[in-house]
Amino acid sequence: MSFDTPLKPYLAIPIQDCGEPLAPINLEGVKSLKPHPYAQVGADYQGRSPYVLRTGVLKRLDQARLTLADIEPSWEILVFDAYRPIAVQQFMVDHTFAEIVARDGLQGQVLTPEQKENIYHQVYQIWAVPNNNPLTPPPHSTGAALDITLLDDLGQPVDMGGEIDELSARSLPNYYQTVEPNSDRQRKEFEQYQRRRELLNTIMESAGFLRHPGEWWHFSQGDQLWAWQYNQRHPDHQKIAYYGRVE
């Protein structure tokens, strides 16, 4: 990291880890990507599986899966990413930085401080800072956060109107409520994207998860981000995080 990044407000939430272990995501109606997309671009998990969660989080994911089955019986949950070691977090920050440099036609060796700061600002819109401080862990390094989407009755990813990890305004959960369509056809598409995102949020919230304010695909339960969001909704019933960094 080449400039001072202000700590996100949720990182001030205290952590009292409950000690639950990680367990494999092995649930009926829940699929995962193989090979893992980050491993495909070179991330080294050192033999560890990214498809693990804290046991309590795993139980809640199963609850969400059952809720989806009630609403869309032939659909399934697709887990894009779950547990992410700090080293992988750092790799993906560096990888995304390099992607932006290439996309914008810049020369990585001669970037000005202002250019670097602008690029890191974009990177940290999506990626948490790969911090080794146990008081401020990245959400995915706690085993309590996961990135997901939906699969249709043919086992194909449902079009959500944007890709996971996309660096654009389309990643905002309610993006399609804020843009004006230019045709009736586009209006129907936008409404469909929004309904699908709301369905994903509905099944996850029904199981106690809360969605990242800036990412339609990211949900967590019991980590600092979750506690911070919960406290915003319930100012008279404050919670702390009970999942911290896990190795």
From Swiss-Prot:
It comes from the Bacteria. GO terms for biological process: cell wall organization; proteolysis. One of its GO terms (molecular function) is D-Ala-D-Ala dipeptidase activity. InterPro entries: A_A_dipeptidase (IPR000755), Hedgehog_sig/DD-Pept_Zn-bd_sf (IPR009045). The record marks R84 as: Transition state stabilizer. The keyword Protease applies. Its EC number is 3.4.13.22. It catalyses: D-alanyl-D-alanine + H2O = 2 D-alanine. It is found in: Cytoplasm. The active site is at E215. Zn(2+) binds at H140, D147, H218. CDD domains: D-Ala-D-Ala_dipeptidase_like. Its cofactor is Zn(2+). Belongs to the peptidase M15D family. PANTHER family: D-ALANYL-D-ALANINE DIPEPTIDASE. Catalyzes hydrolysis of the D-alanyl-D-alanine dipeptide. May have a role in cell-wall turnover. This is D-alanyl-D-alanine dipeptidase. The lineage of its organism: Bacteria, Bacillati, Cyanobacteriota, Cyanophyceae, Synechococcales. The gene is ddpX.
